[in-house]
């Protein structure tokens, strides 16, 4: 097995990543393209992804990536990375490949000067990331449904995403969204919209022109996030409706210069990561 740390500018490397992802998610009917990975891994205005990959000969068998972002931490703009992807080929599981690749990628992020790494781990990857990769578990994001867009930050939080106009335009460029005041909504399923987030804390930010759509009737809203004050009309999604848990994990790379992230000092929204 060979381990390679790289940025995926190479077309051959990108093609191998697409083949791996499509094999891993084939039974779920998901299909990945090089164009999609270029968007997330190369075009990001905050910087190219840190990618760490394992090979068996010419075949990519495991992949981990960290996505550069900016956050406001105690009012200061801080460069960080988010653990975005971690996949391994079904034939090569059981030997902690993802943990090994994650640690290499995290070391590289620290070397490049990023202040912390965080992620939203699903039920499969969460135990290994906490046990073997130095992450601390913070909390699970709230998953709720209701009506209305009067969703606001619940007090002033220590950690929140910082958007430049270039980064926001990039984030909103690939799907259909609409603006309601300072809030952004997205299409999810018939009759349901995602509440992507509010940008009221960055009121000076020019929200870019987006691919507006206009529903004919009020839609139910899906909210995923942390640290918000929601209207009374929102309720937790019942346990019998299955969804992947969003386990928020954190690792400081600043040598203790930053305050610890806690479940009470974070404002986080769907807009801030890549699932919708």
Positions of the model-derived regions?
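Amide-forming acyltransferase catalytic core, primarily the GNAT-like/NAT-type
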Residues: 27-47, 55, 110-114, 123-205, ...
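Hydrophobic alpha-helical core bundles mediating ligand binding, dimerization, or RNAP-core interactions
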Residues: 17-21, 25, 102
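Active-site/acyl-donor-binding loops of N-acyltransferases
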Residues: 117-156, 192-276
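Conserved acetyl-CoA-binding loop-helix of GNAT-fold acetyltransferases
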Residues: 88, 93-107, 203-217
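A short beta-loop-alpha structural element at the N-terminal edge
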Residues: 3-17
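Conserved beta-strand in the GNAT
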Residues: 51-53, 59-68, 82, 87, ...
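Recognition helices and adjacent regulatory flanks at domain boundaries
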Residues: 31, 42, 51, 97-108, ...
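Basic, Lys/Arg-rich alpha-helical nucleic-acid-recognition elements, primarily the DNA-binding modules
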Residues: 13, 37-39, 85
